[in-house]
């Protein structure tokens, strides 16, 4: 399966194919001339796939160096970025060379940020290995790292030269890591793809049902993301729809401590909680929140977070990129397959969270 992200400045393809990791050398050679490549990964994914990818690229004529870091959201910071810069400099990486991100969302976000800022930008490719990264973070060009106060607060818009998705990599994920990716998948069905929502309704919620339908799930999700990014690359309009569940979700991630609550889990909680607020305000059809919660619970995703720690969450919301003055943009789903943007005051949001 192939999807094209047809951006005027930099179009690129998303390849979705089981077993495609075995063809990585051929894929990269079609995009880049033989050169030096830094493979950026984390210690867990690196132990599984780095050698296979390295050998495939070397067989295609590339010189490969590998930079890895400790897995997890806690590593997605400027300290790790600086270590990557030092590594690239010591390896003699130049602007004609490239970086490949091999891993989940943390790896992709961090490697993309490094690629976009090292020497003011070098070539970059994404090979996402987690469900969250395959359906969401590897597409669209957002890169970034966290600060102690807020998630993805430092970042760039930098499109990759291509995205290679091998659904077989999902087989090596732990149960929790696979399930958390369904938070983003459910989001896509809710904001723009009723057909995807119906596919999810037919699944029994087991990990086997996710893996058996992975290509279909990934394709639908990537297609929604692709269409939205092409319409609004720089996040000034409809791309905000992709933040459904993320406002409260990011606040939970920041206040719980990065990595304690996984991203897709936080998104699931955020979707349910923001929908409860929206239904109370008459911004959504009655009963949609119940459907969202039931879908999340079916796949084993959390829908509530305790303790709420409302004051730290309130402080995190104040730093959210959607906050303007004392108001914050709130993405809601008026009906299934449709998203809308409303505003709510930070104080009103705090009052709802305290209930």
From Swiss-Prot:
Its cofactor is NAD(+); Co(2+); Zn(2+). This is 3-dehydroquinate synthase. Belongs to the sugar phosphate cyclases superfamily. Dehydroquinate synthase family. It holds the Pfam family DHQ_synthase. InterPro entries: Dehydroquinate_synthase, DHQ_synth_AroB, DHQ_synth_fam, DHQS/DOIS_N, DHQS_C. It comes from Streptococcus mutans serotype c (strain ATCC 700610 / UA159). Signal peptide: none annotated. HAMAP family: DHQ_synthase (MF_00110). GO terms for cellular component: cytoplasm. It is found in: Cytoplasm.
């Amino acid at each position: 399966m192939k999807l094209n992200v047809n951006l005027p400045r930099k179009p690129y393809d998303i390849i979705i194919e089981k077993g495609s990791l075995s063809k990585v050398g051929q894929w990269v050679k079609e995009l880049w001339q033989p050169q030096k490549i830094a493979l950026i990964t984390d210690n867990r994914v690196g132990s599984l796939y780095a050698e296979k990818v390295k050998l495939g690229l070397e067989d295609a004529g590339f010189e490969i160096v590998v930079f890895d870091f400790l897995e997890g959201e806690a590593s997605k910071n400027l300290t790790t970025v600086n270590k990557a810069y030092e590594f690239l400099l010591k390896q003699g990486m130049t602007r004609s060379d490239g970086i490949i991100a091999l891993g989940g969302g943390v790896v992709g976000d961090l490697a993309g940020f490094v690629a976009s800022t090292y020497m003011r930008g070098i070539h970059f490719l994404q090979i996402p290995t987690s469900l969250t990264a395959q359906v969401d973070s590897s597409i669209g060009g957002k890169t970034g790292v966290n600060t102690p106060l807020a998630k993805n607060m430092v970042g760039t818009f930098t499109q990759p030269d291509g995205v290679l998705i091998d659904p077989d990599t999902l087989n090596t994920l732990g149960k929790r890591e696979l399930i958390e990716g369904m938070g983003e998948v459910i989001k896509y069905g809710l904001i723009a793809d009723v057909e995807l929502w119906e596919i999810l309704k037919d699944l029994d919620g087991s990990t086997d049902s996710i893996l058996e339908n992975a290509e279909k799930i990934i394709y639908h999700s990537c297609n929604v993301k692709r269409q939205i990014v092409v319409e609004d690359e720089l996040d000034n309009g409809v791309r905000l729809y992709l933040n459904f569940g993320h406002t409260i979700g990011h606040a939970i991630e920041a206040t719980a401590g990065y990595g304690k609550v996984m991203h897709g889990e936080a998104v699931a909680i955020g979707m349910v909680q923001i929908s409860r607020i929206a239904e109370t305000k008459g911004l959504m059809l009655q009963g949609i929140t119940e459907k969202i919660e039931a879908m999340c619970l079916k796949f084993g995703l959390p829908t509530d977070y305790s303790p709420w720690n409302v004051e730290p969450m309130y402080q995190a919301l104040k730093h959210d990129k959607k906050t303007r003055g004392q108001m914050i943009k709130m993405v809601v789903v008026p009906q299934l397959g449709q998203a809308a943007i409303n505003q709510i005051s930070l104080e009103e949001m705090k009052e709802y969270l305290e209930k």
